[in-house]
Amino acid sequence: MIKSIPIERILFLDIETVPQAGNWNEISGEEKNLWDKKTLRQRGEDVSAADFYQDRAGIMAEFGKIICISVGMLEKDNRLKIKSFYGDNEKKLLEDFGNIFNSPRLQNIILCAHNGKEFDFPWIARRMLINGFQPPVPFQTFGKKPWEISHLDTMELWKFGDWKSFISLELMAHIFGVPTPKDDIDGSMVAEIYYQEKDLQRIVEYCEKDVLTLANVFRKMRQEDLLTKSE
């Protein structure tokens, strides 16, 4: 029962990712060749490797980078304290993020994200390795039994064993009556906003709002009241 999980131990998390380069012509010939090979089956022969790069490189850890990680934890006043790590320097971002796990409060932390088991958690671990860091203990799953891995995933919790099911965080928020801001941005627009509009702060705000939405969806699944963000 998820209601028995101590919510004060949960680190709610969301990441925003983009392709490593703003356009196809900025990557090396070797990387173009590797991208072509890796994605041929997914895109088919009708879609060029260049077009597919613009659309999909930001969701593959080998060809993308993290530009924002937002995390939230419950405070004693029942507000969610949110902190973001962001910037153009991914290595510095990941180093700063990794350092929070040195805190005594985070020694027995439980990670929670929407589709986190297939996206956020492995993405962070892979990008840390690529940048020369060992992922913090909560991200290391090798050799652990399934019940020893402290990961929560609201998408997985909603499946109830129906592994064909996919549901967006936005839809979960809607069905549970969780208020969400009517932003003019969604995940598919992040790369354009980052590379063309150069508005990273707008992306950070979007990421933080998703963390609050995530926490409130989780609360609703436990039949608990909504949280507000701590200022």
In which residue ranges do the predicted regions lie?
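Metal-dependent phosphoesterase core characteristic of DEDDh/y 3'-5' exonuclease domains
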Residues: 4-8, 64-88, 104-205, 209-231
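Conserved RNase H-like, two-metal-ion catalytic cores of nucleic-acid enzymes
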Residues: 1-99, 103
